[in-house]
Amino acid sequence: MEFEKLLRLMVEKGGSDLFITAGVPPSMKVNGKVLPVTKNALTPEQTREFVYGSMNDKQRAEFDESHECNFAISARGIGRFRVSAFFQRNLCGMVLRRIEVKIPQIDDLALPGVIKDLAMTKRGLIMFVGATGTGKSTSLAAMLGHRNRNSRGHIISIEDPIEFVHQHQGCIVTQREVGIDTESFEVALKNTLRQAPDVILIGEVRTRQTMEYSVQFAETGHLCLATLHANNANQALDRIIQFFPPEQHNQIWMDLSLNLKAIVAQQLIPTPDGKGRKAVIEVLINTPLVSDLIRKGEVHRLKELMAKSNESGMQTFDQALYQLYAEGSITYEDALAHADSANDLRLMIKLGTDAQGADKLSSSVDKLTIQDD
């Protein structure tokens, strides 16, 4: 199969990644599942032709020397792709990631309405958290797109790699890719404030220094958006604090209580027909009560507060799962499998409401505690 046809098929099927490896058919990832494109496995010769055929002379020389090469290609009438070429078992291969030009809309992704409000926030730190492949980049792109269309200013995005290409609309959008436009996140962030930003997006917080920059940007009156690998809001706060030595924890809790705007946690769950996935969103908003708990380091109390604060735009994963199950968007089994507390979610479903269910559950727990005493 011709390489260009593989790229076109990937776009037509809505694939996110294309895998080219000797010994298996060319495969693409669609809705989180890797599916073969053809029945025939690629030979080492075919794989080499695909890999080297996508490179220019400079890239081939780099690949021959280091056995690694990252670059971008454009296919006319098809799209742009980020390529990561490599060797495995002495044979070459590559993975291509489709670079999105069409920026998703918040409403199209069925994200909570509070996300629009957060996108227009003047200052503060907003963390998007979740495992790899849970749609954090897509939701962030929608959020930046909303800001870009509805305000004026300068958005600086530092990513590794760039997954969505934003056009200049209401805002000037500066997108810098680590390894191509800048040496590292730290080097780029060091110079960011000199570039007069209004919004700063940090593709991923991996180090203490990057986390320090995130808080600093919020402190200096900027809106900082960043992603972090964590399963939920509580775990995100625990991960942030673990970047720092114990003697700094009290100061970090104070800094977060003052500068954190929100934590948005995300999962993706298959739809019942298996043809798509639904985003499940947990939202922690830094209200005065939340700020007080964070300042004290009492993260374990946040979940209960979130469950009772729907009017502030907050919701827990279990409440979001209940809503998706109630509207028929996910199955009962998948809802329970992804719940923070399967027992709490079962009770919500049995009672037939998320908010009232949470209050009744809290009351039930209080009664049980009294009986235990």
Predicted regions and their residues:
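Short, flexible helix-loop junctions that flank or precede catalytic/ligand sites
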Residues: 1-373
